[in-house]
Amino acid sequence: MIAFRGVSKVYTAGGREVAALRNVSLRVEAGEIHGVLGQSGAGKSTLIRCANLLERPTEGSVSVDGQDLLALSPEALRKARQGIGMIFQHFNLFGSKTVAANVAYPLEVAGTPREAIRERVEELLSLVGLSDKAQAYPSQLSGGQKQRVGIARALAPRPRVLLSDEATSALDPETTRSVLGLLRDINQKLGVTLLLITHQMDVVKAICDSVSVLERGRLVEQGKVTELLAHPSTRLHQLCFPAFAAPTDAPSGRRVALTLAGEHARRPLLGTLARQFDVDALLVEGAMERVGNTRVGRLLVDLQGSADAVSQALAYLREQGLTLEEAANG
């Protein structure tokens, strides 16, 4: 478990103070994948560097597995950091070392016996699919392979927590999907808690259980990804589903915006309106997104039928728990 409580970070630049983080409090539960989403300058990198005290907060506290890192002695902090692995955006591999030697490095620093290092390196290279690259050098690897080495190295000391600093932003879409799939597998197989920062909504949708949205150093919302996306008023929903374009034609019925999530996104709700209420639903605009193993969608529809029938159809949709907003006619 990771907990930030009232964390602020202020830098001094050019004789003035710049606040990178402003009173941020968030909690990442043990074993989950938590994303921190925000654009450049939002404070994401500062936050993740506070998670292992590469940056010390100006105010607030940071706890990992119940330990207040700021209260630890230098020796105790070094020991605590062994349980926190980090994956970097630009890999940070030693160019003069082989893949196996890069993975072995943190174990050598920790004084691990040579035979135990060899066994652990073999195990990790198998886990990340690079057993055949043990004696290769970073210059001989693709970007995705380099990141897999970085992941293996981060896992070498058997950390309970992995921090991912924009780990896929330098990769092409196909490689990104592959690396995200590997991170999800590691989370499920090893039970490692993963805190990742990203500016890419696709990363959040692909593997995150929960998410925090940062803007200008402030936490604007946090929660389960599917729950936030299911509510049009949330910032995450607005980032994922931009506002519908202004209609160029008058509605041909009562125009309604529907948000579908989970079971609702798999059911023929619009067909049900036609069969059960004699109401036709004309799709004006819409989008459907896959979020982990579920789907979330937002549709703009015109409901056509008698006034009573349309009212009954709307009542039915509300009874089903759908979020809907009715647009003004004309």
From Swiss-Prot:
It comes from the Bacteria. PROSITE patterns: ABC_TRANSPORTER_1 (PS00211), ABC_TRANSPORTER_2 (PS50893), METN (PS51264). Residues 2-241 form the ABC transporter domain. Part of the ABC transporter complex MetNIQ involved in methionine import. Responsible for energy coupling to the transport system. It is a peripheral membrane protein. Belongs to the ABC transporter superfamily. Methionine importer (TC 3.A.1.24) family. It holds the Pfam family NIL. ATP binds at G38, Q39, S40, G41, A42, G43, K44, S45. GO terms for cellular component: plasma membrane. It catalyses: L-methionine(out) + ATP + H2O = L-methionine(in) + ADP + phosphate + H(+); D-methionine(out) + ATP + H2O = D-methionine(in) + ADP + phosphate + H(+). The keyword Coiled coil does not apply. It is found in: Cell inner membrane. GO terms for molecular function: ABC-type D-methionine transporter activity; ATP binding; ATP hydrolysis activity. Its main location: membrane. This is Methionine import ATP-binding protein MetN. The keyword Cell division does not apply. The complex is composed of two ATP-binding proteins (MetN), two transmembrane proteins (MetI) and a solute-binding protein (MetQ).
